[in-house]
């Protein structure tokens, strides 16, 4: 973009901001005015009743609308980088799973961190990846964000084993008309270009009893990564015989014949409407609808050089392909909810929250590399020449209109269809109801009882389709619909004793049932593999679909105990013991399990495919015999496999023991909170891998302990300082023959140190004008990941362990503020730190040497202009 175009874009931003039709980073409210001499008190609803954050005996991180706006935060992923003990595994926009206090969600169907929009649960225990993917809502017009550390299973249920995130939207205001808007224009360096965002809010009063709050957002983010198409024969295979043959060690030296720039661009749109009807002091009715759609042209992922223990980005960085394959991503989320609050008596309140939401998503990935070399099919002269030589005249390219992926790709001989790709299509629908009856008075006794119902349906579909007219049609197709029904009753009772002592006890009883069907077919099912490797490839469509089903149910209780000593109005100490859990479920089937044609290979397994189809795993301590055979004494049966070859895994749970203190000093000018915790994670759901197919098993127990600290201070002279830090130490206690993780290893994806520091400044120039600034540094420590689980047959976890470096991000912001206007310049990632965040999960057959990594956005600088009239 030329300098003139940059100036035009900035001028448009200012004009749109002045019209009030723009966007705000946080709530419609402007960032807070000049800080007072004392820290502001924050009201939270973490215990499902209103309390002050400093009076609530829970380790938590709370960001208000002013905090979010002062830092210029626009999405939860950026916010999460500074929350102690909170880790992320991300595949890009709206493809993120959150983990807290060392509890990893790499296995299983359910997130470890419950995410709520107000009181509606968004983290569904759905099948495969979708259950862990949380939408990344725009932080515009949020009243606050509450991050509750540690198990919250008593009040928040199965998906809150590690903690809970509550996104509280700003509510309509009765009798007040208000408009706010903000426009943001920025530029991303290191290959990116112009980004644009607009959000706006309107608060419409209808008399003195009703009001409607409308919120809209739209943004476009430029891509900064490229896609490189390599010369024919550039197949990543350690066995290929073509000349030249570029193997993983020198793959990036292969000739580049085509380049697509900025392929990871994305757009986001969202809308939210909340109606408040309050006819009297006893009753309030609050319906809400929300819609959000996100689309991207490719993940924020690059290929890497080097070994898993020392990965580096090649130059130029990007994704290298055998030929051009587009990788679009798309996600649409729709929610409707109804909240009713009714004061039964002056001291008893009844609350009902009904939620209905659905999510559609599409993820597509390049599958050429994996399909080319999976299970040894990467050699020239094998039964499938397509695996190495895409220009083989025996298997010509179809027309672009038949390629199934939009065409317009670049083949080895010029323009042609896209290459073999993989698509994951997910649909999830959830209906939920929560009914609570609670005391609302100010006496010594406080109580709450409630009921929760969940009806969830999810459909996970995967397509891996060959784009050639040869013998292979569908490489792999899988349909996996699942239903979950859950009922729970919960309650909490607390009593305030003399001398500041307070004791509370809570419990949640739950029962859930699930059923899952699976239909798969294609040559890359394991039964299909058996035919291929025997030298008898079948014509496309001749491998009949393989159908299986499984189900189960379980019940249990989640207790919680708390003892608090309020020493005085500024100092508190508390002790908490709590239990958390997540649901069990089913895996994909072993396709050749108990099949007559696989009996011989199961008796004397000689390949990884044999292990997979027979439901066998290789012990961590065993070693293969010579000639590639697998020593039968070193094999163990996969646990919990039903008669149809479908493995199932049980619920895992955690016991948490923590002691904490919350303190204020210097007449509320400073605070210091500290929590120490110990957790015992029992029967953890761990991902393991056989022949490229991922499975979840219940592994050996793990111990986790750590510290969480928060400090806030009003320093005077216009300065405020805030810092949050967390330390987590974890280790597995046994050498598990099932999950393959050795004793003493830490839990994957768990940085030992996380934290942030933030310095705010405000100085008044006149009575209604001032300047402000903010500098925030966020740090995430080193960790390792197991994106393919532990391929235990390798007998060495280091061969699949991918190390991720520590990183720190510095964000800067400064501007001018009046009563209605705010204008700010900002630099995000000011040090231009580009790092490897996470390995990109492969939805195709998982092969470690083709690992791609998610990377963060390079330095981005821009202008932010906002306006507010009336309301809050």
Language-model segments: which ranges?
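N-terminal Sec signal peptide and the immediately downstream disordered periplasmic leader
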Residues: 1-73, 77-81, 203, 281, ...
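Gram-negative outer-membrane beta-barrel transporters
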Residues: 499, 503, 669-682, 697-788, ...
């Amino acid at each position: 973009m030329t300098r003139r175009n940059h100036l035009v874009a900035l001028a448009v931003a200012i004009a749109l901001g002045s019209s009030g039709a723009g966007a705000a980073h946080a709530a419609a409210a402007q960032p807070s005015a000049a800080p007072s001499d004392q820290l502001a008190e924050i009201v939270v609803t973490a215990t499902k009743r209103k309390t002050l954050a400093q009076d609530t005996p829970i380790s938590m991180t709370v960001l208000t609308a002013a905090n979010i706006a002062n830092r210029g935060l626009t999405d939860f992923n950026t916010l999460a980088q500074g929350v102690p003990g909170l880790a992320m595994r991300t595949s890009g926009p709206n493809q993120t799973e959150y983990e807290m206090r060392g509890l990893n969600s790499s296995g299983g169907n359910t997130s470890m961190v419950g995410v709520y929009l107000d009181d509606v649960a968004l983290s569904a225990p759905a099948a495969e990846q979708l259950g862990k993917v949380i939408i990344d809502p725009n932080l515009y017009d949020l009243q606050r964000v509450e991050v509750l550390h540690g198990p919250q299973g008593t009040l928040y249920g199965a998906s809150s084993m590690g903690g809970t995130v509550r996104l509280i939207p700003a509510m309509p205001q009765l009798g007040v008309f208000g408009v706010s808007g903000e426009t943001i224009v920025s530029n991303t360096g290191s290959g990116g270009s112009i980004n644009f965002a607009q959000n706006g809010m309107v608060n419409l009063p209808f008399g003195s009893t009703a009001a409607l709050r409308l919120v809209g957002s739209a943004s476009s983010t430029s891509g900064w990564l490229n896609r490189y198409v390599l010369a024919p024969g550039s197949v990543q295979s350690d066995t290929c015989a073509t000349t030249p043959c570029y193997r993983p060690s020198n793959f990036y030296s292969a000739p580049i014949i085509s380049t697509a720039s900025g392929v990871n661009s994305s757009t986001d749109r969202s809308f939210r409407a909340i109606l408040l009807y309050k006819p009297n002091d006893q009753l309030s009715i609050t319906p809400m609808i929300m819609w959000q759609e996100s689309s991207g042209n490719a993940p924020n992922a690059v290929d890497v050089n080097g070994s898993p223990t020392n990965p580096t980005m090649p130059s130029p960085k990007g994704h290298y392909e055998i030929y051009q394959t587009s990788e679009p991503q798309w996600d649409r989320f729709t929610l409707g909810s109804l909240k009713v609050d009714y004061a039964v008596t002056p001291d008893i309140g009844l609350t009902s929250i009904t939620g209905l939401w659905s999510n559609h998503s599409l993820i597509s990935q390049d599958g050429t590399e994996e399909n080319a070399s999976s299970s040894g099919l990467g050699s020239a002269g094998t039964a499938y020449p397509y695996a190495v030589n895409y220009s083989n005249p025996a298997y010509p390219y179809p027309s672009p209109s038949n390629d199934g992926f939009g065409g317009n790709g670049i083949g080895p001989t010029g323009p042609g269809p896209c290459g073999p790709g993989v698509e994951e299509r997910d649909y999830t629908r959830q209906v939920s109801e929560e009914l609570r009856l609670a005391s609302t008075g100010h006496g010594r006794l406080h109580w709450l009882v409630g009921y929760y119902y969940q009806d969830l349906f999810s459909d996970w579909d995967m397509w891996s389709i060959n784009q050639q007219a040869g013998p292979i049609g569908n490489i792999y197709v899988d349909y996996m619909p699942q239903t979950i029904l859950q009922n729970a009753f919960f309650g909490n009772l607390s009593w305030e004793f003399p001398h500041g002592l307070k004791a509370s006890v809570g419990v949640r009883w739950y029962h859930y049932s699930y059923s899952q069907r699976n239909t798969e077919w294609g040559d890359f099912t394991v039964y299909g593999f058996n035919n291929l490797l025997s030298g008898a490839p079948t014509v496309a469509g001749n491998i009949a679909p393989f159908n299986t089903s499984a189900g189960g149910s379980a019940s249990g209780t989640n207790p919680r105990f708390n003892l608090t000593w309020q020493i005085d109005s500024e100092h508190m100490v508390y002790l908490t013991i709590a239990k958390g859990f997540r649901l069990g479920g089913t895996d994909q089937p072993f396709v050749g399990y108990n099949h007559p044609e696989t009996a011989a290979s199961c008796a004397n397994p000689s390949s990884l495919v044999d292990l997979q189809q027979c439901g066998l795993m290789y012990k961590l301590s065993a070693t293969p015999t010579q000639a590639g055979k697998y020593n039968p004494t070193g094999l163990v049966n996969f646990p919990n496999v039903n008669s149809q070859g479908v493995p199932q895994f049980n619920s895992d749970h955690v016991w948490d023991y923590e002691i904490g203190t919350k303190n204020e000093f210097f007449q509320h000018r400073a605070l210091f909170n500290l929590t120490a915790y110990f957790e015992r994670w029992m029967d953890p759901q761990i991902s393991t891998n056989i022949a490229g197919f991922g499975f979840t098993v219940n592994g050996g127990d793990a111990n986790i302990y750590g510290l969480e600290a928060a400090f806030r201070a009003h320093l005077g002279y216009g300065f405020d300082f805030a810092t949050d830090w967390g330390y987590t130490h974890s280790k597995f206690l046994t050498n598990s023959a099932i999950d393959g993780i050795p004793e003493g290893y830490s839990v994957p994806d768990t940085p030992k140190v996380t934290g942030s520091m933030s310095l705010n400044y405000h100085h008044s120039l006149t009575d209604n004008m001032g300047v402000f600034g903010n500098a925030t540094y966020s740090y995430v420590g080193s960790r390792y990941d197991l994106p393919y689980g532990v391929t235990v047959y390798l007998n060495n976890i280091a061969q699949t362990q991918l190390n991720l470096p520590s990183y720190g991000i510095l964000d800067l912001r400064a501007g001018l503020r009046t009563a209605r206007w705010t204008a700010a310049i900002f630099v995000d990632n000011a040090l231009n730190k580009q790092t490897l965040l996470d390995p990109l999960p492969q939805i195709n057959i998982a092969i470690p040497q083709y690992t791609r990594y998610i990377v963060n956005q390079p330095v981005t600088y821009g202008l932010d202009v906002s306006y507010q009239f009336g309301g809050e």
